[in-house]
Curated annotation (Swiss-Prot):
Highest taxon listed in the record's lineage: Eukaryota
UniProt record similarity statement: Belongs to the CBP3 family.
A molecular-function term among this protein's GO annotations: ribosome binding
Protein's organism: Saccharomyces cerevisiae (strain ATCC 204508 / S288c)
Note: Present with 14200 molecules/cell in log phase SD medium.
Function: Chaperone required for the assembly of ubiquinol-cytochrome c reductase of the mitochondrial respiratory chain.
Pfam families hit by this protein: Ubiq_cyt_C_chap
Keyword line: Chaperone, Membrane, Mitochondrion, Transit peptide, Transmembrane, Transmembrane helix
UniProt protein name: Protein CBP3, mitochondrial
Annotated TM spans: 152-169
Location of this chain's protein in the cell: Mitochondrion membrane
Targeting presequence: 1-38
Gene Ontology biological process terms, A to Z: mitochondrial respiratory chain complex III assembly; positive regulation of mitochondrial translation; protein stabilization
Length: 335
C-alpha cells in the first residue's frame, strides 16, 4: 500500500457511489490512510455531518460576504486558454509537437503548468466557491450549510488550502524534481489568482494593502500545511486539531461531529489519490470525491484487475508510434 513518508499509489477507479439516506454498511479495513477500525462503518462525510444532533447555529451568520459576484464571472483569469471551450489551432498544435520533438523537452516538467497551475488549482478553488444570488454547489453546501462555516473570502481561502494540501501529499510522492515543480506551480497560481480577485472582486484599490493581504494569506498557507502534515504523520486527533485551528478558525463551541466529518473527508480523498499512479496523477486524472459520496476500499482482486488494465493501457500508449510527443511521459504507471 503506502506510508506517510512515501505516498505510493495504485489505481484510480475505486468504487464510488452516492450514499442514500439508508444503505447496507460496507466495512473498511485499516490502512495507512484509513485509520478507523474495521468494525467502524463508514457513512459519507456529508451524511456524518448531517447526523449531528446538536443542531448548532451557523458560525458568524452576520458575515456572508460573497467570495465571487455573479455579474463578473472569471473562471481563473482573463486568459482564453483556460476556458474549457478553447481549442488550440491546428497549426499551433503541430508547431508545438515539432518543438517538443526537436528539443527533446521533458513533458513531465512542462506539463506541471497546465495540470497543477491550471487544472488542479481550478478544482481546489471550486470546492468552496460561491456566487452571489446563485445556489451553492453540492460541495459548497457541505462546507457552508452542513458544517455551518461562514461565507467569507477568508473561509473560501481556507477551504482551498485544505484541498491543495491534499494534493501536496500526493505530489511529494512523485520523483522529487517533478513533485516539487507541481507544488510550486500550484502555489504560484494560487497567489496570482488571489491578487487578481483582490483588485477585481474585493475592490482593493491600494497595492500596499493588497501586498499585506497576500503576506497574510501566505502565512496562513504555510501554517496550515505544517499543521496538516503534523496531523497526517501522527494521529486523527492531531489532524482534527489542525482542521479546527485552520478550517474552523479555532472558534469555540465547534461540533465534534463536524470535525470527524472533515477528517473522514480528508482520508477519503487521500485513499483515492493513493490508488493513482504517478503518470495518472501528473496528467490530471484526479477529481475530488464529493462529500456525499462514500469511498469503499478495493479488494486485493480488484486491485490486481485495475492494475493490469492500467499497465496494459499505458504500455500500448508508449508503444504506439502515433502517440504525440506531448502525450508521452517518463513517469511510472505501475506504482
Amino acid at each position: 500500500m503506502m506510508s506517510v513518508n512515501r505516498f505510493t499509489s495504485g489505481r484510480l477507479p475505486v468504487f464510488l457511489r452516492k450514499s442514500p439516506f439508508y444503505y447496507s454498511r460496507a466495512y473498511l479495513h485499516q490502512t495507512c490512510v484509513f485509520k478507523q477500525n474495521k468494525e467502524t462503518a463508514q457513512d459519507s462525510p456529508e451524511l456524518l455531518a448531517k447526523s449531528s444532533h446538536l443542531n448548532s447555529k451557523p458560525l458568524d451568520v452576520s458575515n456572508k460576504a460573497p467570495v465571487k459576484t455573479a455579474q463578473n464571472k472569471i473562471p481563473l483569469a482573463h486568459s482564453k486558454y483556460e476556458s474549457s471551450k478553447y481549442e488550440l489551432p491546428k497549426w499551433k498544435e503541430a508547431l508545438g509537437e515539432l518543438v517538443i520533438r526537436a528539443f527533446h523537452l521533458d513533458m513531465d516538467r512542462v506539463r506541471a503548468g497546465p495540470v497543477a497551475g491550471s487544472y488542479y488549482y481550478k478544482i481546489c478553488k471550486e470546492q468552496g466557491l460561491q456566487y452571489e444570488d446563485e445556489p451553492l454547489s453540492e460541495t459548497a453546501k457541505y462546507f457552508y450549510e452542513d458544517l455551518k462555516l461562514p461565507r467569507t473570502f477568508s473561509q473560501w481561502f481556507q477551504i482551498t488550502v485544505l484541498h491543495e494540501w491534499i494534493l501536496f501529499v500526493r505530489m511529494r510522492a512523485m520523483p522529487f524534481k517533478y513533485g516539487r515543480n507541481y507544488q510550486q506551480k500550484l502555489v504560484d497560481r494560487t497567489f496570482s489568482d488571489i491578487e487578481l480577485r483582490l483588485f477585481e472582486e474585493m475592490k482593493v484599490n491600494s497595492g500596499r494593502i493588497a501586498d499585506q493581504y497576500l503576506k497574510d494569506f501566505n502565512t496562513q498557507l504555510r501554517g496550515a500545511i505544517f499543521a496538516y502534515d503534523e496531523g497526517f504523520a501522527t494521529d486523527d486527533g492531531t489532524l482534527a486539531t489542525a482542521v479546527w485551528r485552520n478550517l474552523f478558525g479555532g472558534r469555540k463551541n465547534i461540533d465534534m461531529v463536524h470535525l470527524e466529518s472533515v477528517v473522514r473527508y480528508i482520508y477519503s480523498q487521500l485513499y483515492v489519490l493513493s490508488r493513482l499512479s504517478d503518470r495518472e496523477f501528473a496528467t490530471g486524472k484526479f477529481k475530488f470525491v464529493p462529500p456525499g459520496v462514500k469511498v469503499e476500499k478495493l479488494t486485493p482482486k480488484q486491485e490486481e484487475e485495475l492494475k493490469a488494465k492500467t499497465i496494459a493501457k499505458y504500455e500500448a500508449l508508449d508503444k504506439d508510434p502515433k502517440t504525440l510527443p506531448s502525450e508521452r511521459s517518463r513517469l511510472s504507471y505501475t506504482n
